[in-house]
Amino acid sequence: MKRSKSYRKAAEQIDRTRLYTPAEAVRLAKETSTVKFDATVEVAMRLGVDPRKADQMVRGTVNLPHGTGKTARVLVFAAGERAEQARAAGADYVGDDDLVERIQQGFLDFDAVVATPDMMGKIGRLGRILGPRGLMPNPKTGTVTMDVAKAVSDIKGGKIEFRVDRHGNLHLIIGKVSFDEQKLLENYLAAVDEVLRLKPSAAKGRYIKKITLTTTMGPGIPVDPNATREAAKAA
């Protein structure tokens, strides 16, 4: 793949023979972003787990202290009083059978899905659509709940969901290039700290094998997992 001149120039600023501390990586991410819009900053991790085994699955949520820089569009499956609570909390779409039908017809203009427990029977038929996109509500991530107002508020406030893929990779958005370095660093450490907390007891050897920080269409910055672990503990 042919890279642009600006990309190649940005990539030259990154020393591939070393691993950067989290603070250095965040600074470089801001300096090497070459696009003309407010790029997204993402952290990618390679974990020492076998996700094919149920006891090594890594999945969870984290409330980023400074949000992601993007207001998530939240869809809520609820009826009656819970539906009103969801609307009052700022949900973008609220309904039940009508939303099931819209999604079956191809509607996917949302970033997160919340549901009351009684709605899960109806939502089950959407598994093939929502599941592969990481949008299926789940009690473990707080998206199947009677307290829909809190779930909506948390998501709007910067709560993100993550899940390791079948290759052991994990991707988390931690903000925008326009964030100052300290805010990006605090978001980064909050995300990593939660991933560390969720280390499966069945996982053997090194848990976090590799960390890369990237911006939209920008070069990857290798981050030191050991320095990250120490910084997360101290945060």
From Swiss-Prot:
GO terms for cellular component: large ribosomal subunit. GO terms for molecular function: rRNA binding; structural constituent of ribosome; tRNA binding. Keywords: Repressor, Ribonucleoprotein, Ribosomal protein, RNA-binding, rRNA-binding, Translation regulation, tRNA-binding. Coiled coil: none annotated. It holds the Pfam family Ribosomal_L1. It comes from the Bacteria. InterPro entries: Ribosom_uL1_bac-type, Ribosomal_uL1, Ribosomal_uL1-like, Ribosomal_uL1/biogenesis, Ribosomal_uL1_3-a/b-sand, Ribosomal_uL1_CS. The keyword Ribosomal protein applies. GO terms for biological process: regulation of translation; translation. Part of the 50S ribosomal subunit. PANTHER family: 54S RIBOSOMAL PROTEIN L1, MITOCHONDRIAL, LARGE RIBOSOMAL SUBUNIT PROTEIN UL1M. Binds directly to 23S rRNA. The L1 stalk is quite mobile in the ribosome, and is involved in E site tRNA release. Belongs to the universal ribosomal protein uL1 family. This is Large ribosomal subunit protein uL1. The lineage of its organism: Bacteria, Bacillati, Actinomycetota, Actinomycetes, Streptosporangiales.
